[in-house]
Amino acid sequence: MHEKQVKSILSAQNGMNLYRGCTHGCIYCDARSTCYQMDHAFEDIEVKSNAAELLEKALKSKRKKCMIGTGAMSDPYLHLEKRLCLTRRSLELIDYYGFGLSIQTKSDLILRDLDLLKSINRKTKCVVSMTLTTYDEALCRIIEPNVCTTGRR
């Protein structure tokens, strides 16, 4: 893991990745592609340490409310999220400023933030997507070795 100060956190389409890289080890992962020009090993997670400040600034300056998307390139609930809480802080900001959320994950750690997800959904809209690759627990551990099994999801 290494930290990096970034210049922006939201894409033009309101996508947000708080982390860059992944430790899930999914054999089918597209985010490993060299077309994304990562300058470090994919498993060496880049933590966007100034993400919360940038997100708050971006949300304050938006003229229209919209859905903020996260989880497309890096799971927002990687194992280190338990300690860093960048996703939780971002959800607090999204909730506070009244934006919607679309979040993708393979982790049951999302349950930690159920209070915020419910609050966002009451005010606007919150869509949670979870990958369910296979219900075969043994196969799941082979194709997604470092994440909770489909049964836990």
Language model features with spans:
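Conserved Radical SAM active-site core
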Residues: 1-129, 135-138
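Glycine-rich S-adenosyl-L-methionine
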Residues: 146-153
